[in-house]
C-alpha cells in the first residue's frame, strides 16, 4: 500500500505520550472525554488521594483539572472545554484557584541526596507560580520569597501570602511516592526512609506544611501515585485526606472502557485504511490491554483498558496498516523493572509459599486489599498482595471464601511477570540462551518440533531445581513451564483455559494476527507425580492427560483460536523434577 494512503488531512492525531491537555484540545488531537468526573471530584472530600498503575493517564488527568480550575485559563474555557461534558455542565468552582503543581518524578530518589532535588524542584515551581500570579499577589512577594530557604519554608510562605491576598490555592502533587523506589530496590534504605517519613524527617515536614496550609489558602489538594506505602507513612496523622483509589465512583476515571475504545476505532476506521473490522481489533487488543477492575463493586460490570497501550496499538496500526508485531511498548517494559524488586522481596518472605509462584501456578491469589500500609510492613502477605494490585500486576476478579480474588489482568502484565520470574532464576546461575530459545520457538511454531522445545524446558527445570530444593512441587513445575512458554513470541500461553469441557493446563494460542504464516498450535496437558509416588502413578496420570487433551481439543474455543494451524495435543508428566513422559496424542 502506498505510504501516502496513511496521511489523511483533518484526521485527529492520537495523543500518544501526551500530558498537556491544552495541546491536545488546540492541536486537533483525539480526546476521550473524562470531564464528567470533575463534578464528582468536586463533590468529594477536598483532599483527594488517588492511586493507579503507571501509564494510566494520571498526569493528563491532573493537567485537565489544572486547566479547569486555574484562574489564568478563564479566557480559554470555551476553547478547551466548550464541546465537552464539563463545558455544558460547568461547576461553580471553575477557574477560581491559583494552581500549584508539584511533580516529584524527576527528583533524585536516592534518600541520601533527595533533599537537594526536592528543594530545587519546589523552588523553581514556586518561583514560576509567583511570576504567573504576580498581579494577584502582594508586590513584595518576589523579594520575600528569596529570603526563604528550602521547599518547606517556601511552601509555608506561599500559602500564607495567598491567604493574605484573599486567594485560594489548588495543590496538585504528581508521583508523590517517587521516593518509595529506594526502599523497594535497597532494603538497607528502609531505616533512612523511616527517618525521613516520620518524626522530624524532611519529607514528613513538607507534608506537615501541606496539612498546615489547609488551614490557610490551600483549599483543595489532589495527590496521585502508584502505591499507598508512602501515603501511609507520610500522612498518618494527616486526617484530612481521603483515598478514593478503591471507590466504584471513580473506577472509570483513568483508562478506557471498551465502549470508549470502540468509539475511537470507529472514528479512525472511517478515515484510515483498516484491514480489520472494529470487532476483530477488539478481539486482538482485549487479551493484552483490558481487564483492570479497580473496585470490588464494579466486578462483572466494567473493566478498564490501559489507555497508553491502546493509543500505542492504534497509532502503530494506523501508521503501518497492520497489527504491531510487538504488542508491548518499550516504555512499559522499563516501568515494569519494579517487578524485579518485588519478586526479589517476595523470595525473602518468611511464610512458606511464594505469593508470585502461587499466582503463576494457581492462576489467582486471595487477599484483603489495603488502603495503605507502612513500608516496614511490606512483607505482610496481604500488604504485598495490595502492592502488586496497585502496581497493576493484579486485578479484582470477584470473591473467594470471603476475600478478594485477584488475577493477572492481561498478557502485557503476564509477559512481564513471567519474564522477571525467569530473571530471578537467572540470579541463581541458571542461564538461558536467548539464541537457543529463539530457534526452538521458531521450530515449534513453523516445523512442529515440540520434542526439542519441551525437552529444553525440562532440562532447565531440572538444573534449576537441583539448586533450589525448596521450590520442588507441582506449583513450581507448572509455574516454570508457563514462564518459559511465555517467552515464545509466537504464542499467547493461556493457563487453565476455561472451555466447555473444563480446564486445560496450557493452551499455546497461536498469534495469527501477527504471524499469519505459522502452522502449528498446541494443547499441553501437564501432570505431576511426587517423588515418593509409585511408578504406576506416572502411567495413571498419562492416561488421564490423554483423555483430557482429547476433550479440550474438540471445544469451540480451541477450534476458533487455532485457525488453519495443525493442533498438537502434547502430554507431559513429571515425577519430581524429572520429565518421564513427553508424547503427542494422535
Which sequence ranges carry the predicted segments?
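Extended alpha-helical interface modules used as scaffolds for assembling large macromolecular complexes
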Residues: 241, 300-547, 551-553, 581-586
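Conserved P-loop NTPase mechanochemical-coupling segment
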Residues: 16-19, 101-151, 179-194
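Walker A/P-loop-proximal flanking segment of P-loop NTPase domains
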Residues: 2-70, 78-87
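Domain-level recognition of nuclease-like catalytic cores that cleave nucleotide substrates
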Residues: 557-586
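Structural recognition of the conserved hydrophobic beta-strand(s) that form the central parallel beta-sheet
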Residues: 172-174, 204-205, 219-226
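Substrate-engagement module of ASCE P-loop NTPases
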Residues: 157-165, 192-219
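P-loop NTPase motor core
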Residues: 33, 67-131
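Amphipathic alpha-helical segments of the small helical/lid subdomains adjacent to P-loop NTPase cores
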Residues: 230-236, 244-315
